[in-house]
């Protein structure tokens, strides 16, 4: 397992790509502006001209970049998976980009994100359960401390291998529940202290159902304003974002003890149903065999849904929208709406003007 965690030969990306990212030379004075950010959630880094233009046009200065997942393999071992790979071809670059040797605008802040499957924190798996360091465990069990060490070291190694400098924050994404809270929180506490030694802050995603529970021991949270309904139900028309589902969870945001930012959805799903029953989400046409009698439905948030969510968050706690994050920076997602619509999201106003 150590070889897999430490083997970075397959993830040596283009050092020159991130060298330009880390050059701190902003052309605009953004001291009085709210933070504009986006997630980059993919297994392949492809910063083509359309994404670059979107970033520059909307003055996005921070990217939350998914580095890798952490999952259990078939033997129950906790392992890294789906590590971010860069597209090393030149076909996505314009002549100007090649000449400038720049795939990103200057001044971009990168926040590495690691997604951890909740099963990694369940203690009742057949092998290698992760459990509290204080619990009675076998000597071969994975512990929160060991996992924190491995994840932080892997992030730091990826940063170094790809010339990603000046990283001030890392983020953990996990759909934790009451049954995994203790192990997950202990892991976060340890990781926070280890990151602090490197002068790095720790943030974590916060799902709506987690708002009613004790906040995780991190420096700040990102409230995920999406995946609010049951995509497996054909009758659920708005599984990505429906304020009827959101409203009960956000009533007490003003008293939430952890500093928050909010992430809003741009993505859509193509969902396959067979005889009214959920088959899966189709990310590609060949993900599932499609029968003539099957139904493929498209689920996506409309601009009105997103703006209702933005206004609702403003009403509950306007400080949350001091940083607006789009999920995610995908070529299709950034073409869904007009340019002025994205400005409305960032500016928190339906008329597109700044607050």
Predicted segments with their positions:
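Boundary/entry segment of secreted carbohydrate-active catalytic domains
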Residues: 26-55, 60, 66
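Bacterial N-terminal signal peptides
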Residues: 11-22
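Bacterial N-terminal signal peptides that target proteins for export
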Residues: 2-13
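Conserved, mostly hydrophobic/aromatic
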Residues: 63, 172, 221, 262, ...
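Substrate-binding surface in catalytic domains of secreted glycosidases
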Residues: 186-274
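Short, acidic/polar
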Residues: 44-56, 144-161, 210, 305-314
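Chitinase-like catalytic core of GlcNAc-active glycosidases
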Residues: 31-33, 37-40, 69-71, 75-223
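Substrate-binding cleft of secreted/luminal carbohydrate-active enzymes
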Residues: 267-269, 275-355
């Amino acid at each position: 397992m150590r070889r897999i965690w430490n083997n970075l030969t397959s993830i040596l990306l283009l050092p020159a790509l991130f060298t330009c990212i880390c050059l701190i030379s902003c052309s605009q004075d953004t001291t009085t502006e709210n933070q504009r950010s986006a997630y980059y959630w993919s297994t392949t880094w492809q910063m083509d001209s359309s994404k670059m233009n979107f970033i520059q046009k909307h003055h996005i200065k921070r990217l939350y970049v998914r580095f890798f997942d952490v999952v259990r393999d078939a033997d129950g071992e906790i392992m890294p998976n789906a590590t971010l790979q860069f597209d090393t071809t030149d076909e996505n670059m314009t002549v100007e980009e090649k000449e400038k040797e720049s795939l990103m605008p200057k001044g971009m802040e990168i926040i590495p994100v690691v997604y951890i499957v909740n099963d990694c924190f369940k203690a009742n798996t057949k092998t290698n359960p992760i459990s509290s360091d204080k619990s009675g465990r076998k000597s071969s069990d994975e512990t929160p401390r060991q996992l924190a060490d491995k994840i932080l070291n892997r992030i730091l190694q990826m940063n170094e291998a790809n010339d990603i400098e000046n990283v001030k924050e890392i983020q953990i994404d996990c759909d934790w529940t009451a049954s995994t809270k203790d192990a997950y929180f202990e892991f976060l506490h340890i990781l926070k202290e280890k990151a602090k030694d490197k002068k790095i802050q720790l943030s974590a995603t916060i799902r709506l159902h987690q708002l009613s529970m004790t906040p995780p021991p991190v420096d700040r949270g990102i409230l995920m304003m999406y995946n609010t309904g049951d995509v497996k139900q054909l009758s659920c028309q708005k599984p990505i974002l429906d304020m009827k589902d959101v409203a009960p969870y956000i009533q007490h945001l003003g008293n939430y003890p952890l500093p928050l930012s909010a992430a809003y959805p741009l993505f859509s799903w193509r969902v396959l149903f067979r005889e009214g029953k959920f088959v899966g989400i189709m990310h590609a046409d060949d993900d599932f065999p499609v029968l003539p009698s099957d139904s493929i439905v498209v689920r996506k948030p409309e601009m009105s849904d997103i703006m209702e969510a933005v206004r609702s968050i403003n009403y509950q706690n306007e400080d949350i929208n001091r940083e607006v994050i789009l999920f995610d920076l995908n070529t299709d997602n950034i073409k869904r709406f007009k340019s002025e619509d994205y400005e409305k999201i960032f500016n928190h106003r339906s008329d597109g003007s700044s607050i």
